[in-house]
């Protein structure tokens, strides 16, 4: 299994090639059979994808921080992901399942910044899954809190 930046036909239009430190790896049902089953992203590649901002209260922050980053859906598209379930893993090996349907129907983001600043590992970075809790109050519950993984480093796409 090879690790590469974006592969296939979308690589030229979706994001630049890998040039910095890998902060996110997608594995499983990604890419094409010819390119392998792992796609790596650095911060620049994630920044090149369509960005979204969510201002929302969370159980883990004071006030209503402004989170920004690419939607999970755009990351899945860039990695040519196909599947129904995501296993999102953190630095400490915590993992949570997220239905791909969440990414397709809710503007969930892989936040790389809080209030315009890159999220450090100490502040729950490099990537934090953020749901639009204030915009969709029905999401403010334990089901979605467990899917809001912080210190994300890997996503496995399952069938």
Show where each model-derived region lies:
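N-terminal export signals
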Residues: 1-11
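N-terminal intrinsically disordered, low-complexity segments enriched in P/E/S/T
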Residues: 10-159
């Amino acid at each position: 299994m090879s690790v590469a930046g974006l592969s296939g036909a979308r690589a030229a239009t979706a994001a630049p090639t890998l040039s910095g430190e890998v902060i996110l790896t997608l594995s499983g049902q990604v890419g094409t059979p010819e390119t392998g089953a792992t796609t790596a992203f650095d911060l620049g590649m994630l920044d090149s994808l369509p960005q979204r901002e969510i201002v929302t209260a969370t159980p883990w922050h004071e006030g209503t921080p402004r989170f920004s980053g690419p939607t999970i859906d755009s990351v899945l598209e860039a990695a040519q992901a196909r599947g129904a379930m995501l296993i999102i893993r953190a630095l400490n090996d915590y993992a949570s399942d997220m239905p791909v349907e969440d990414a397709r129907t809710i503007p969930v983001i892989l936040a790389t910044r809080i209030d315009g600043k890159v999220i450090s590992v100490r502040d729950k970075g490099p990537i934090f899954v953020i749901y639009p809790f204030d915009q969709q109050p029905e999401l403010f519950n334990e089901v979605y809190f467990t899917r809001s993984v912080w210190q994300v480093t890997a996503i496995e796409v399952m069938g």
